[in-house]
């Protein structure tokens, strides 16, 4: 069903959504598609230039900035960049990466994207009513996107010092704590579907090392699963497998 909707929207093109009802339909789809593509590493037509231009025009025309629409666009851009980052680096022999102009260009582009993400947060912090659940959701996604984007650079050692976006441990911990706090508030005091929280919770869980912390994420995912979103179980299974791998790697490092 979701695939069929995607194809219909794609074939119609961005110019087909002139009415407010059509725009709401497209915006709802964008939120779901952004979550899907960033969690599973898939490509999306929403990252194509004509769809990005459409999104930019609609944001500029709004009387009040839509924080959900703008963070959704950043999720789509970050997901597309992530896919390209891995594809391009893997295509370069390892011994050539350190001095590759492609790698240098990726570092620069990644830094610029990180700046855009941070600028989004700065603009949102100036807006009123941070207690609004959709603002809270947008903030949870911001912290998750920042973790996701910066973590992607840690999988390679081909970067020159100071050329890539990085988070220190205090910043990582701050993002994770914020995600858990915001997701709990959203689940307990709003009607926002829990499935929309899966990406932030997955990113928070991926940065937890202690069992009591991981249980906190499990409990929130169980709440989402019990509310009818069975995909939460899949996310929990993925996290458990990741935690087992992470623990094995930590054990190997300690034994060396």
Language model: regions and residue ranges:
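Intrinsically disordered, low-complexity regulatory regions with latent secondary structure
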Residues: 220-256
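Amphipathic alpha-helical interaction segments
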Residues: 37-38, 59-60, 128, 237, ...
């Amino acid at each position: 069903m979701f695939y069929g909707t995607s194809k219909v929207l794609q074939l119609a093109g961005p110019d087909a959504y002139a009415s407010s009802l059509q725009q709401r339909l497209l915006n709802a789809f964008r939120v779901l598609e952004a979550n899907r593509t960033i969690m599973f590493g898939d490509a999306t037509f929403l990252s194509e230039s004509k769809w990005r231009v459409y999104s930019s025009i609609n944001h500029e025309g709004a009387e009040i900035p839509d924080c959900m629409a703008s963070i959704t666009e950043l999720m789509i851009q970050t997901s597309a960049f992530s896919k390209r980052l891995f594809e391009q680096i893997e295509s370069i022999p390892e011994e050539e990466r350190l001095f590759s102009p492609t790698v240098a260009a990726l570092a620069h582009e990644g830094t610029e994207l990180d700046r855009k993400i941070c600028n989004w947060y700065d603009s949102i912090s100036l807006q009123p009513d941070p207690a609004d659940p959709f603002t809270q959701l947008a903030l949870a996604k911001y912290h998750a996107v920042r973790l996701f984007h910066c973590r992607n650079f840690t999988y390679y050692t081909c970067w020159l010092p100071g050329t890539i976006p990085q988070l220190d441990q205090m910043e990582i911990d701050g993002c994770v704590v914020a995600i858990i706090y915001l997701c709990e508030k959203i689940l307990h005091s709003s009607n926002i579907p829990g499935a929309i929280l899966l990406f932030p919770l997955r990113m928070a869980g991926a940065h937890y090392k202690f069992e009591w912390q991981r249980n906190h994420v499990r409990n929130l995912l169980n709440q989402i699963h019990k509310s009818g979103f069975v995909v939460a179980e899949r996310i929990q299974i993925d996290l458990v497998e990741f935690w087992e791998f992470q623990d094995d790697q930590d054990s190997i490092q300690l034994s060396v």
